[in-house]
A protein has these predicted regions:
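A positively charged, amphipathic N-terminal helix/segment that binds anionic biomolecules
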Residues: 1-3, 79
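Short beta-strand/turn micro-motifs at beta-sheet edges
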Residues: 3-7, 67-68
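N-terminal helix-turn-helix DNA-binding core of bacterial DNA-binding proteins
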Residues: 5-49
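Basic amphipathic alpha-helical segments that dock to polyanions
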Residues: 50-57
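Beta-hairpin "wing" of winged helix-turn-helix
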Residues: 58-74, 80
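Accessory beta->alpha helical hairpin/"wing" motif in late/C-terminal subdomains of nucleic-acid enzymes
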Residues: 81-85
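Amphipathic alpha-helical dimerization/coiled-coil segments
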Residues: 86-113
Length: 113
Protein backbone atom coordinates (compact mmCIF):
# COMPACT_ATOMS: atom_id res chain seq x y z
CA UNK A 1 0.00 0.00 0.00
CA UNK A 2 1.52 3.37 -0.98
CA UNK A 3 2.32 5.91 1.70
CA UNK A 4 -0.24 8.69 2.12
CA UNK A 5 0.58 11.99 0.48
CA UNK A 6 2.35 14.36 2.83
CA UNK A 7 2.36 18.15 2.41
CA UNK A 8 5.88 19.48 1.88
CA UNK A 9 6.82 21.62 4.90
CA UNK A 10 7.12 25.29 4.01
CA UNK A 11 10.63 26.21 2.96
CA UNK A 12 11.77 22.72 1.97
CA UNK A 13 10.74 22.62 -1.70
CA UNK A 14 13.80 24.60 -2.81
CA UNK A 15 16.12 22.20 -0.97
CA UNK A 16 14.37 19.17 -2.48
CA UNK A 17 14.64 20.61 -6.00
CA UNK A 18 18.34 21.33 -5.50
CA UNK A 19 18.88 17.77 -4.27
CA UNK A 20 17.09 16.22 -7.25
CA UNK A 21 19.11 18.36 -9.65
CA UNK A 22 22.36 17.39 -7.89
CA UNK A 23 21.68 13.87 -9.19
CA UNK A 24 21.26 14.92 -12.84
CA UNK A 25 19.79 17.75 -14.94
CA UNK A 26 16.03 17.48 -15.42
CA UNK A 27 13.01 19.32 -16.76
CA UNK A 28 10.17 20.37 -14.47
CA UNK A 29 8.01 17.30 -15.00
CA UNK A 30 11.07 15.07 -14.49
CA UNK A 31 11.84 16.79 -11.18
CA UNK A 32 8.29 16.19 -9.95
CA UNK A 33 8.48 12.54 -11.05
CA UNK A 34 11.81 11.94 -9.28
CA UNK A 35 10.53 13.52 -6.05
CA UNK A 36 7.51 11.24 -6.12
CA UNK A 37 9.52 8.15 -7.11
CA UNK A 38 12.31 8.53 -4.54
CA UNK A 39 9.86 9.37 -1.73
CA UNK A 40 7.60 6.44 -2.66
CA UNK A 41 4.77 8.88 -3.49
CA UNK A 42 4.90 10.63 -0.11
CA UNK A 43 6.27 13.85 -1.64
CA UNK A 44 4.19 15.15 -4.51
CA UNK A 45 4.52 18.66 -5.86
CA UNK A 46 2.10 20.44 -8.16
CA UNK A 47 3.05 22.67 -11.08
CA UNK A 48 1.67 25.72 -9.29
CA UNK A 49 4.44 25.35 -6.71
CA UNK A 50 7.20 23.77 -8.79
CA UNK A 51 7.58 26.25 -11.64
CA UNK A 52 7.63 29.40 -9.47
CA UNK A 53 10.28 27.67 -7.32
CA UNK A 54 12.38 26.81 -10.38
CA UNK A 55 12.12 30.41 -11.59
CA UNK A 56 13.10 31.73 -8.14
CA UNK A 57 16.10 29.37 -7.91
CA UNK A 58 17.23 30.35 -11.40
CA UNK A 59 16.97 34.06 -10.50
CA UNK A 60 19.11 33.46 -7.41
CA UNK A 61 21.78 31.92 -9.63
CA UNK A 62 21.47 28.44 -8.13
CA UNK A 63 20.14 26.87 -11.34
CA UNK A 64 20.79 27.33 -15.01
CA UNK A 65 18.36 26.30 -17.70
CA UNK A 66 18.97 25.06 -21.24
CA UNK A 67 16.46 24.05 -23.89
CA UNK A 68 17.04 20.43 -24.94
CA UNK A 69 15.12 17.60 -26.51
CA UNK A 70 13.25 15.52 -23.92
CA UNK A 71 12.60 11.77 -23.90
CA UNK A 72 9.42 12.41 -25.86
CA UNK A 73 11.26 14.26 -28.62
CA UNK A 74 9.84 17.64 -27.61
CA UNK A 75 11.87 20.66 -26.55
CA UNK A 76 11.94 21.14 -22.79
CA UNK A 77 13.75 23.43 -20.39
CA UNK A 78 16.33 21.32 -18.52
CA UNK A 79 17.62 22.65 -15.22
CA UNK A 80 21.00 21.95 -13.65
CA UNK A 81 22.80 23.19 -10.56
CA UNK A 82 25.36 25.96 -10.76
CA UNK A 83 28.42 26.06 -8.53
CA UNK A 84 26.55 28.38 -6.15
CA UNK A 85 23.59 25.97 -6.29
CA UNK A 86 25.82 23.15 -5.05
CA UNK A 87 27.09 25.41 -2.28
CA UNK A 88 23.54 26.37 -1.31
CA UNK A 89 22.49 22.72 -1.23
CA UNK A 90 25.34 21.88 1.15
CA UNK A 91 24.26 24.75 3.40
CA UNK A 92 20.59 23.70 3.28
CA UNK A 93 21.49 20.07 4.10
CA UNK A 94 23.61 21.17 7.06
CA UNK A 95 20.76 23.31 8.43
CA UNK A 96 18.25 20.50 7.86
CA UNK A 97 20.50 17.97 9.64
CA UNK A 98 20.81 20.29 12.65
CA UNK A 99 17.04 20.85 12.79
CA UNK A 100 16.08 17.20 12.40
CA UNK A 101 18.70 16.21 14.97
CA UNK A 102 17.23 18.67 17.47
CA UNK A 103 13.69 17.46 16.76
CA UNK A 104 14.84 13.85 17.25
CA UNK A 105 16.31 14.80 20.66
CA UNK A 106 13.02 16.40 21.66
CA UNK A 107 11.00 13.38 20.50
CA UNK A 108 13.34 10.98 22.32
CA UNK A 109 13.15 12.86 25.62
CA UNK A 110 11.39 10.85 28.33
CA UNK A 111 9.06 12.27 31.01
CA UNK A 112 10.65 13.23 34.32
CA UNK A 113 10.15 10.54 36.93
Amino acid sequence: MPSPRFPIPQGTLDMLILQILSLEPAHGYGIAQRLEQISKSVVQVNQGSLYPALHRLEQRGWLKADWKESETGREAKFYSLTRSGHKQLRSEKHSWDRLTGAVRLIFDERPAQ
